[in-house]
Protein backbone atom coordinates (compact mmCIF):
# COMPACT_ATOMS: atom_id res chain seq x y z
CA UNK A 1 0.00 0.00 0.00
CA UNK A 2 1.21 3.48 -0.88
CA UNK A 3 0.11 6.73 0.71
CA UNK A 4 -0.26 10.02 -1.16
CA UNK A 5 -0.57 13.51 0.26
CA UNK A 6 -3.83 15.21 -0.73
CA UNK A 7 -3.66 18.92 -1.56
CA UNK A 8 -6.43 21.46 -1.79
CA UNK A 9 -6.93 23.86 -4.73
CA UNK A 10 -4.51 26.33 -3.12
CA UNK A 11 -1.75 23.72 -2.89
CA UNK A 12 -1.93 23.23 0.88
CA UNK A 13 -1.96 19.79 2.49
CA UNK A 14 -5.51 18.59 3.12
CA UNK A 15 -5.04 14.98 4.21
CA UNK A 16 -3.81 11.66 2.90
CA UNK A 17 -5.07 9.01 0.48
CA UNK A 18 -3.95 5.44 -0.09
CA UNK A 19 -3.56 3.36 -3.22
CA UNK A 20 -3.01 -0.39 -3.23
CA UNK A 21 -2.55 -2.12 -6.60
CA UNK A 22 -0.87 -5.39 -7.47
CA UNK A 23 2.14 -4.87 -9.73
CA UNK A 24 4.39 -7.02 -11.89
CA UNK A 25 7.59 -8.61 -10.62
CA UNK A 26 10.62 -6.34 -10.86
CA UNK A 27 12.29 -8.70 -13.34
CA UNK A 28 9.40 -8.54 -15.83
CA UNK A 29 7.96 -5.06 -15.19
CA UNK A 30 9.96 -3.18 -17.84
CA UNK A 31 9.26 -5.76 -20.55
CA UNK A 32 5.56 -5.83 -19.68
CA UNK A 33 5.16 -2.05 -19.85
CA UNK A 34 7.24 -1.91 -23.05
CA UNK A 35 4.95 -4.42 -24.77
CA UNK A 36 1.89 -2.49 -23.60
CA UNK A 37 3.24 0.76 -25.06
CA UNK A 38 4.15 -0.95 -28.35
CA UNK A 39 0.63 -2.39 -28.56
CA UNK A 40 -0.98 0.98 -27.86
CA UNK A 41 1.12 2.77 -30.48
CA UNK A 42 0.55 0.00 -33.02
CA UNK A 43 -3.23 0.21 -32.51
CA UNK A 44 -3.13 3.95 -33.23
CA UNK A 45 -1.80 3.37 -36.76
CA UNK A 46 -4.38 3.58 -39.54
CA UNK A 47 -2.70 1.08 -41.84
CA UNK A 48 -4.34 2.61 -44.94
CA UNK A 49 -1.19 3.35 -46.98
CA UNK A 50 -1.59 1.82 -50.43
CA UNK A 51 0.27 1.79 -53.76
CA UNK A 52 -0.54 0.31 -57.18
CA UNK A 53 1.31 -2.73 -58.46
CA UNK A 54 2.05 -3.10 -62.17
CA UNK A 55 -1.11 -5.18 -62.44
CA UNK A 56 -3.22 -2.31 -61.07
CA UNK A 57 -1.76 0.69 -62.93
CA UNK A 58 -4.06 1.91 -65.69
CA UNK A 59 -3.00 1.50 -69.33
CA UNK A 60 0.08 -0.23 -70.67
CA UNK A 61 -1.60 -2.61 -73.08
CA UNK A 62 0.29 -1.20 -76.05
CA UNK A 63 4.04 -1.51 -76.51
CA UNK A 64 5.39 2.06 -75.99
CA UNK A 65 7.74 1.92 -79.00
CA UNK A 66 9.07 -0.65 -81.39
CA UNK A 67 11.44 -3.37 -80.24
CA UNK A 68 14.41 -2.47 -82.40
CA UNK A 69 15.93 0.49 -84.16
CA UNK A 70 15.51 3.22 -81.53
CA UNK A 71 18.80 2.73 -79.70
CA UNK A 72 16.91 2.55 -76.40
CA UNK A 73 16.33 -0.35 -74.06
CA UNK A 74 13.37 -2.49 -75.05
CA UNK A 75 10.08 -1.80 -73.28
CA UNK A 76 6.92 -3.87 -73.39
CA UNK A 77 4.60 -1.75 -71.25
CA UNK A 78 4.43 1.63 -69.53
CA UNK A 79 3.31 -0.13 -66.34
CA UNK A 80 6.78 -1.53 -65.68
CA UNK A 81 8.29 -0.46 -62.32
CA UNK A 82 11.28 0.88 -64.27
CA UNK A 83 9.25 3.81 -65.66
CA UNK A 84 7.90 6.88 -63.83
CA UNK A 85 4.20 6.34 -63.18
CA UNK A 86 4.59 2.58 -63.40
CA UNK A 87 3.73 0.02 -60.76
CA UNK A 88 5.44 -0.10 -57.37
CA UNK A 89 7.39 -3.19 -56.32
CA UNK A 90 6.76 -4.33 -52.74
CA UNK A 91 4.91 -1.10 -51.90
CA UNK A 92 2.62 -0.74 -48.87
CA UNK A 93 -0.86 -2.23 -48.92
CA UNK A 94 -3.67 -1.75 -46.37
CA UNK A 95 -2.97 -3.89 -43.32
CA UNK A 96 -3.57 -4.04 -39.58
CA UNK A 97 -0.71 -3.35 -37.20
CA UNK A 98 -2.58 -4.57 -34.12
CA UNK A 99 -0.59 -6.56 -31.58
CA UNK A 100 -2.18 -9.15 -29.31
CA UNK A 101 -1.87 -8.88 -25.53
CA UNK A 102 -3.87 -10.69 -22.89
CA UNK A 103 -6.35 -8.63 -20.87
CA UNK A 104 -4.69 -9.65 -17.60
CA UNK A 105 -1.33 -8.49 -18.94
CA UNK A 106 -2.78 -5.16 -20.10
CA UNK A 107 -4.32 -4.46 -16.71
CA UNK A 108 -1.14 -5.55 -14.92
CA UNK A 109 0.96 -3.26 -17.13
CA UNK A 110 -1.36 -0.34 -16.34
CA UNK A 111 -1.20 -0.93 -12.59
CA UNK A 112 2.58 -1.35 -12.72
CA UNK A 113 3.03 1.88 -14.70
CA UNK A 114 0.88 3.87 -12.28
CA UNK A 115 2.61 2.55 -9.17
CA UNK A 116 6.01 3.16 -10.78
CA UNK A 117 5.13 6.85 -11.17
CA UNK A 118 3.79 7.26 -7.64
CA UNK A 119 6.53 9.74 -6.69
CA UNK A 120 5.27 12.08 -9.43
CA UNK A 121 1.60 11.80 -8.45
CA UNK A 122 -0.14 14.87 -7.01
CA UNK A 123 -3.60 14.24 -5.55
CA UNK A 124 -5.93 17.25 -5.44
CA UNK A 125 -9.17 17.57 -3.50
CA UNK A 126 -12.10 19.02 -5.50
CA UNK A 127 -9.97 19.77 -8.57
CA UNK A 128 -11.37 22.81 -10.38
CA UNK A 129 -14.75 22.72 -8.60
CA UNK A 130 -14.43 26.42 -7.80
CA UNK A 131 -14.27 27.36 -11.50
CA UNK A 132 -17.50 28.99 -12.66
CA UNK A 133 -16.28 29.63 -16.22
CA UNK A 134 -13.40 28.36 -18.41
CA UNK A 135 -10.16 30.03 -17.25
CA UNK A 136 -6.85 28.73 -18.58
CA UNK A 137 -4.94 31.03 -16.23
CA UNK A 138 -6.66 29.46 -13.21
CA UNK A 139 -5.47 25.98 -14.20
CA UNK A 140 -1.89 27.09 -14.94
CA UNK A 141 -1.70 29.01 -11.63
CA UNK A 142 -3.07 26.01 -9.74
CA UNK A 143 -0.41 23.73 -11.28
CA UNK A 144 2.29 26.17 -10.12
CA UNK A 145 0.83 26.16 -6.59
CA UNK A 146 0.89 22.36 -6.63
CA UNK A 147 4.62 22.39 -7.41
CA UNK A 148 4.48 21.40 -11.07
CA UNK A 149 7.41 22.75 -13.11
CA UNK A 150 6.49 25.31 -15.78
CA UNK A 151 7.96 23.25 -18.65
CA UNK A 152 6.74 19.85 -17.40
CA UNK A 153 4.44 17.57 -19.35
CA UNK A 154 1.37 17.14 -17.15
CA UNK A 155 -1.32 14.46 -17.22
CA UNK A 156 -4.51 15.45 -15.38
CA UNK A 157 -6.75 12.51 -14.47
CA UNK A 158 -10.28 13.30 -13.28
CA UNK A 159 -13.22 11.04 -12.53
CA UNK A 160 -15.58 12.87 -14.91
CA UNK A 161 -14.02 16.06 -16.38
CA UNK A 162 -16.51 18.90 -16.70
CA UNK A 163 -16.83 20.98 -19.86
CA UNK A 164 -15.45 24.00 -17.96
CA UNK A 165 -12.25 22.15 -17.09
CA UNK A 166 -11.93 20.70 -20.60
CA UNK A 167 -12.09 24.17 -22.13
CA UNK A 168 -9.72 25.57 -19.51
CA UNK A 169 -7.07 22.93 -20.21
CA UNK A 170 -7.24 22.58 -23.98
CA UNK A 171 -5.09 25.67 -24.68
CA UNK A 172 -2.22 24.47 -22.46
CA UNK A 173 0.29 22.85 -24.81
CA UNK A 174 1.94 20.44 -22.36
CA UNK A 175 -1.14 19.54 -20.34
CA UNK A 176 -3.33 16.57 -21.24
CA UNK A 177 -6.68 15.82 -19.61
CA UNK A 178 -8.20 12.34 -19.49
CA UNK A 179 -10.95 10.62 -17.54
CA UNK A 180 -10.10 7.92 -15.02
CA UNK A 181 -11.58 5.27 -17.32
CA UNK A 182 -9.24 6.36 -20.15
CA UNK A 183 -6.05 5.41 -18.32
CA UNK A 184 -3.31 4.08 -20.58
CA UNK A 185 0.32 3.08 -20.11
CA UNK A 186 1.78 5.50 -22.67
CA UNK A 187 0.29 8.63 -21.09
CA UNK A 188 1.27 7.49 -17.59
CA UNK A 189 4.91 7.00 -18.61
CA UNK A 190 5.14 9.99 -20.97
CA UNK A 191 4.12 12.70 -18.50
CA UNK A 192 6.52 14.33 -16.04
CA UNK A 193 3.80 14.93 -13.45
CA UNK A 194 0.48 13.19 -12.78
CA UNK A 195 -2.29 15.28 -11.23
CA UNK A 196 -5.24 13.22 -9.96
CA UNK A 197 -8.44 14.27 -8.30
CA UNK A 198 -9.36 12.46 -5.09
CA UNK A 199 -12.41 10.98 -6.85
CA UNK A 200 -10.26 9.69 -9.73
CA UNK A 201 -7.90 7.97 -7.29
CA UNK A 202 -10.84 6.26 -5.61
CA UNK A 203 -12.23 5.17 -8.98
CA UNK A 204 -8.86 3.72 -10.03
CA UNK A 205 -8.68 1.79 -6.76
CA UNK A 206 -12.21 0.49 -7.31
CA UNK A 207 -11.63 -0.62 -10.92
CA UNK A 208 -8.09 -1.97 -10.69
CA UNK A 209 -7.74 -2.86 -7.01
CA UNK A 210 -9.55 -6.21 -7.14
CA UNK A 211 -7.12 -8.03 -9.45
Swiss-Prot record:
Keywords: Ribonucleoprotein, Ribosomal protein, RNA-binding, rRNA-binding. HAMAP family: Ribosomal_uL4_B. Belongs to the universal ribosomal protein uL4 family. It comes from the Bacteria. Residues 41-53 have a biased composition (Polar residues). InterPro entries: Ribosomal_uL4 (IPR002136), Ribosomal_uL4-like (IPR013005), Ribosomal_uL4_dom_sf (IPR023574). Residues 60-71 have a biased composition (Basic residues). One of its GO terms (molecular function) is rRNA binding. The keyword rRNA-binding applies. Residues 41-78 are annotated as: Disordered. GO terms for cellular component: ribonucleoprotein complex; ribosome. This is Large ribosomal subunit protein uL4. Part of the 50S ribosomal subunit. One of its GO terms (biological process) is translation. The gene is rplD. PANTHER family: 50S RIBOSOMAL PROTEIN L4 (PTHR10746), LARGE RIBOSOMAL SUBUNIT PROTEIN UL4C (PTHR10746:SF17). One of the primary rRNA binding proteins, this protein initially binds near the 5'-end of the 23S rRNA. It is important during the early stages of 50S assembly. It makes multiple contacts with different domains of the 23S rRNA in the assembled 50S subunit and ribosome. The keyword rRNA-binding applies.
